Amino acid sequence: VLVPEPGFVLYHPHAVLAGAKPVAYGLREEEGFQPDIDEIQELITDKTKALVVNSPSNPTGGVLSREIFDALADIATDHRLWIVSDEVYDNYIYEGIHHSFCEHLDHSIVVNSFSKSLATTGWRIGYMATNEEAIAQVSKMHYYTMACPPTPIQYAIMISMPSMGEFLKNVVPVFDNRRRKMVSMLNDIPGFDCVMPRGAIFAFPTYQMNIPSMELAKIIASHGVICSPGIAFGRKGEGHLRFSYAASEENIENGLNVVRNVVESL
């Protein structure tokens, strides 16, 4: 199973738990963290069964361009691969548009969630879209792992769905402002360089200090600010930190001032 790296922390272990071997493919930071199509082509063997795609991306904030989206779909068709598309942040797009693999359900499994679109992160309720053949197989596994989400949560989501559009209409511009503020402040920190994320709720800057990301994240945490070490998202994530702008502008400003002070003291 080909998985993006830097990528969400669960892709590798989920592949292993399914009895597969995860193989990482890179994202081109200089192009807004677009998947490296040439590398993906080189990594495919007769044992490759699936390609995991995440757009908008956690942790990078990258959003697939139409060109890359079409190239991935063509690769899947040519090599008879399943695409597993994580589209949890599809409603949080600030630049460009979201391209969904719902266009290719004959060989795609699209995974989504209400965690972000309805701000119900802790409820752990989502959904998937694919073809009937895949649904039949997934249903078997699903029954023996969790059966179903709690009924009260299902009712709460059902009641909330009609107002989801209005909620997102109000929330997304707020997150866009937070995104711009965070990236601007990160790029003002000596040695930091942050690509502007086009979607999701994270910034993923690089830093020039010769300190492992896990150690640097711990130092920053000891001063009261939480960020995620890049290494948590795979070896290709080392040298980065992930910051979330799902916080007030005041907290973003105060938190990044702390980060700046920490960096300047090292």
Outline where the language-model segments fall:
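Conserved core segment of the aminotransferase class I/II
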Residues: D106-D176, R180-M185, V263
